[in-house]
Every structure is written in structure tokens, then in C-alpha cells.
């Protein structure tokens, strides 16, 4: 099959889905649902796309209903104020991203699979993940963390980072993360802006066969951030070393088994802070909300990526990249996610493909 380019010449398409696959996709199911439930007669993708950008209230209201978003209070409108900046989406709604992400966790099915260069393959079942998130969220509350407080992390792409993000969201606190390949100055350029109350950090990691210890850096960060009241160490490398004075053990904080509790927050309540690249000065914080991320990522994972409960999702990503956050929210459609902390081309150049094959991604 070929398509015409702007210059009028034809080029060969690398791949196009079969009609059977298209008809069986979640995008097709959503379109059929819209036709039936909303009485909007849409034929083909172009009409669906046109409706999505022309009728914002109708489309995003349909996304909310189609995915049956969990909310303790329903919104009074979809788009109450269209001014930009300042648009107001789903006023009156109260929900929590972590609750919606974890609702599809199955007790005995893998939710998170962790691969790294130096540790055995680690699996968190749905039961494990929900329990650890609830335990850490309870410990954060016991530390005095409240909705709107910032929790900063200095962690690699490992299952513990997934737990920490979701626990922070469960409390209604605001997550922000830098990868441990960042130096002290790069991290402080970001975290000083947000004044975190809790700092979670890794003891070290292995990349390309080389151990990189990070306890000294974590101590420097903790000392340079006067807002930090508690420092938590994730023992990943386990190479020894002295943790910062008074540091708490992540393993101990996730050992409890309390009932899950999810703080109900407004749709636009801050969820996490990402950062610009820093090429034009100090990196700028970019805030995303519980509701906005939930709807956008449900749409992306289910409709665009055609992902569901029988799928496994793997993204090679640093925790400092927004695509890592997207990996985590694949849990919201019931998928299993695979994390990898290590070199993408060692021990062999096809390392990432080997992981995909072994984990049936």
C-alpha cells in the first residue's frame, strides 16, 4: 500500500493494521459506544477525530463515562470556562488518580515487573502493589504529609518508584522526581523550587556493569533542602555505605497492611511537577493535575495504544522523562508494566528486544 506525499510522489507505508484488527480495536469500540450511547453518528476515524476537536464537552464527557471514572463527587459540567489560560474542566468533581490507576489491579496477576542489571527479576502482583501503596501512603501521612505538600524522589526506573509515585498521589501530595544520574546541582535546581517535605532516594544503581553509589549525594541533597523533614532510602544497589543521619528505610515503610485510603481531591488538584529541559536557564516546573492526567492517559493507553488487561507495556525511560509517568499510568487500563534499570545495549545491543521477548511485551 502507498500514500501520496505533499510533493505528489508515492511512498510505501511500512505497516497498516488489518481490517479485522481495526474492527477489534478499543478505538473502534469507543466509536461504536459513542454512536450508540451518545447518538452521535460517526463513520470512520476522521469523523471521530473531527468530533473530538469540535465538541470538547461532548468528547471529554464521553471519555469520562466510557472509562467509568471513579469519583466521590461528580462534576457539574465538563468545560465550565474556556478561557486560555484558565480553562475550568469538570468543576465539582472529586477523585484520586491512584485510586483509578489501582482499581484494575488483580490480586495474583503481575502488576509491575522489575528488571535491572544486578538484581533478580522482581514481580509485584496487584495485591502487592495495592498493599505497598497503602502502607507507604499511611506512613507519609504519619510523617505529616498533607494534600498539596511536595514529595521529591531521586530514584531510577524500578518498582519502588512506581509505589512511591502512587502513594504520594493517594495522599494528595505532589510528586516530583529526578533520575539518579543527575548530579547534585541539577537536582537542586529543580527541587529547591518546590520545597519538598519528604525526599526519597536510592542508595545507588548499576549501569553498564559499573556500580554508581548515591548515598553521599542523597545526604548532600537532604542537607541543602531545608524544607525536607524526612529522608527515605531505597536500598537498590545494597553496596554498603552510610545513609543520611535519621534516614528511614523504604522497605520498612511498605511492610504494613492497612486498608487503602485515597484522598479525594478536585479535578485540577496538582498531581506531579515535571520540568523543562533547562536549556534557557533554570528548569521550569510544569504542573499536571489528577483529573487531566487521568483522562488523557486513559484515552492514550486504551484508544491510541490499544492497550488493555491482557497487555504488557515496556518503555525504556529515565524517571526524569515524562514517558516514565506514562508507563506508570498504563496500570489504569489493567496492563502489566515492565520497568528496566540498566544499559539499553548491554550485555548485547538487542538488550531491550530481549526484555520484550522474555516478558512477552
Model-derived features with residue positions:
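A short N-terminal helical cap/helix-turn-helix that marks the beginning
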Residues: 53, 61-75, 91-113
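Conserved adenylation A10 loop of the ANL superfamily
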Residues: 118-120, 273-285, 301
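Structural core segment of the AMP-binding/adenylate-forming
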Residues: 166, 170-251, 351, 358-361
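AMP-dependent adenylate-forming
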Residues: 32-41, 77, 98-125, 235-242
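Conserved AMP-binding/adenylate-forming core of the ANL superfamily
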Residues: 46-51, 98, 112-166, 183-188, ...
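Conserved AMP-binding/adenylation subdomain of ANL enzymes
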Residues: 294-312, 321-361
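Conserved pre-ATP/AMP-binding loop-to-beta segment of ANL
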Residues: 108-110, 232-233, 244-275, 282, ...
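A short helix-loop-beta submotif of the ANL/AMP-binding
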Residues: 137, 150, 156-184, 194-199, ...
Amino acid at each position: 500500500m502507498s500514500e501520496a506525499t505533499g510533493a505528489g510522489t508515492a511512498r510505501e507505508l511500512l505497516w497498516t493494521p488489518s481490517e479485522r484488527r481495526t474492527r477489534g480495536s478499543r478505538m473502534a469500540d469507543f466509536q461504536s459506544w459513542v454512536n450508540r450511547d451518545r447518538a452521535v453518528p460517526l463513520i470512520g476515524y476522521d469523523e471521530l477525530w473531527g468530533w473530538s476537536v469540535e465538541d470538547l464537552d461532548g468528547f471529554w464527557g464521553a471519555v469520562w463515562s466510557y472509562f467509568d471514572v471513579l469519583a466521590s463527587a461528580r462534576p457539574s459540567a465538563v468545560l465550565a470556562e474556556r478561557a486560555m489560560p484558565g480553562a475550568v474542566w469538570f468543576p465539582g468533581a472529586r477523585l484520586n488518580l491512584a485510586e483509578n490507576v489501582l482499581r484494575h489491579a488483580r490480586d495474583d496477576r503481575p502488576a509491575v515487573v522489575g528488571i535491572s542489571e544486578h538484581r533478580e527479576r522482581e514481580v509485584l502482583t496487584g495485591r502487592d502493589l495495592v498493599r505497598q501503596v497503602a502502607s507507604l501512603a499511611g506512613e507519609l501521612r504519619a510523617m505529616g504529609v498533607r494534600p498539596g505538600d511536595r514529595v521529591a524522589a531521586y530514584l531510577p526506573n524500578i518498582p519502588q518508584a512506581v509505589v512511591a509515585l502512587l502513594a504520594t498521589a493517594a495522599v494528595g501530595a505532589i510528586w516530583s522526581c529526578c533520575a539518579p544520574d543527575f548530579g547534585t546541582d541539577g537536582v537542586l535546581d529543580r527541587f529547591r523550587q518546590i520545597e519538598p517535605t519528604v525526599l526519597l532516594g536510592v542508595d545507588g544503581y548499576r549501569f553498564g556493569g559499573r556500580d554508581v553509589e548515591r548515598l553521599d549525594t542523597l545526604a548532600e541533597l537532604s542537607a541543602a533542602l531545608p524544607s525536607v523533614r524526612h529522608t527515605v532510602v531505597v536500598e537498590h544497589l545494597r553496596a554498603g555505605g552510610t545513609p543520611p543521619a535519621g534516614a528511614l528505610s523504604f522497605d520498612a515503610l511498605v511492610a504494613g497492611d492497612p486498608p487503602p485510603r485515597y484522598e479525594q481531591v478536585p479535578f485540577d488538584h496538582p498531581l506531579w511537577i515535571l520540568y523543562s529541559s533547562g536549556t534557557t536557564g533554570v528548569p521550569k516546573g510544569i504542573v499536571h493535575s489528577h483529573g487531566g492526567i487521568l483522562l488523557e492517559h486513559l484515552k492514550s493507553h486504551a484508544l491510541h495504544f490499544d492497550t488493555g488487561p491482557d497487555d504488557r507495556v515496556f518503555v525504556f525511560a529515565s524517571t526524569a522523562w515524562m514517558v516514565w509517568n506514562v508507563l506508570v499510568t498504563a496500570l489504569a487500563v489493567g496492563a502489566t508494566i515492565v520497568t528496566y534499570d540498566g544499559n539499553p545495549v548491554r550485555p548485547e545491543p538487542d538488550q531491550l528486544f530481549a526484555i520484550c521477548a522474555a516478558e512477552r511485551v
